Amino acid sequence: MDFKIAVLAGDGIGPEISVQGVDVMSAVCEKFGHKVSYEYAICGADAIDKVGDPFPEETYEVCKNADAVLFSAVGDPKFDNDPTAKVRPEQGLLAMRKKLGLFANIRPVQTFKCLIHKSPLRAELVENADFICIRELTGGMYFGEKYQDNDKAYDTNYYTRPEIERILKVAFEYAMKRRKHLTVVDKANVLASSRLWRQIAQEMAPNYPEVTTDYMFVDNAAMKMIQEPAFFDVMVTENTFGDILTDEGSVISGSMGLLPSASTGESTPVFEPIHGSWPQAKGLNIANPLAQILSVAMLFEYFDCKEEGALIRKAVDASLDENVRTPEIQVADGAKYGTKEVGQWIVDYIKKA
C-alpha cells in the first residue's frame, strides 16, 4: 500500500514527538513493504508567527491531498496570557476540523497493567477499563452563533438531524466491532438539543439489534466514569460534553502521554496525541512520544492494516515492560530515557520483530 502523509508538527513539544511518529511509521512501512511519503506543513502558533494564520490555505491543501494527517500539538503561552488576541493557535485546530469535515473524534481510554499505579483511581476500579469516547466535533456551541458585549453573551448549541445521525452511525458501528454496548450521553432533561439527540438515537437503535443501547445524563456519566469506568464500551456525545468527558477519561490511564486519538469524517482523517503542546518542555527531550506513536497505530488500523497496528502496540507494551520510559512514567529507580531514546527503542524493536 502507498501512503501519502501530511505531517503537522505544530508547537511546543510537537516537532520532537512528530519525529518519533514519522520514524515509527517509516519503520513499519519498510517492514511490511509499504511505500510512504511525507509532506510537512505549518499550523498553530508557528503558522501565526510566519504567515498570520493558524491554519493557512497552503496547509489545508497539503492535508486535503494526503491520505492521512499526522498531527502533534498546537498552543503557546503568549496567546493564552493575552485575552485581547484575535488570532489563536487553537483556532487552527478548529479550522482544520471544519475544513476537512472531521465530525467524529475517536478517543480510546485504556490502562496499561504496568502503569495502573499511576492512575489517580484505585487499581481495582481501572484494571479492566477499556472504552472509546466518540465526540461530535463540528457542531454545537463551539460552532453555533455567538454574541458578546459588556452586559451579555451567548453561545448557541445548534444541531441538525444529519449531523446527529452521522455521528451516531459511527458510534453504533464501533460498538458492533467491540463489546456491543453503546452509551448515549446527553442532558435531555434540560436541553432541547439533547432531546433531539436522544430521539434520533432511539430511532436508530432498532437498526442495530445486537447493540445494547443505554442513555445517560452527562453529570451521571461523569460520575460513572470515575466510579465504574469498566462499565463503558463505546460512549457517544455532543461536542461540548465530549470535550469535557474525554479529558476526564484521559486521566484514568495515569498519563495523557499514553493516549492517541483519531478524527474522521468527510475528507482526510487526522491522527494525533490527546495532550497539548507543553511549551515548558520544548527542546528538553523529556516529552513522552507514546501517544504520538500510538496515533500511528490508529492510522494503520484505520486503513485496515491490522498487523501493522498490532506490531506498534506490541512494541509500545514491550517498551513499558522493559522500563524504557520518559520521566513522568518511569519507576523510581529506572534509567533515564528521553523522547528520542524511547522512539528509537521502539523503532529498533519493530525492525527486529
UniProtKB/Swiss-Prot annotation:
Its EC number is 1.1.1.85. One of its GO terms (cellular component) is cytosol. It comes from the Bacteria. Pathway: Amino-acid biosynthesis; L-leucine biosynthesis; L-leucine from 3-methyl-2-oxobutanoate: step 3/4. Its cofactor is Mg(2+); Mn(2+). Homodimer. This is 3-isopropylmalate dehydrogenase. It comes from Bacteroides thetaiotaomicron (strain ATCC 29148 / DSM 2079 / JCM 5827 / CCUG 10774 / NCTC 10582 / VPI-5482 / E50).
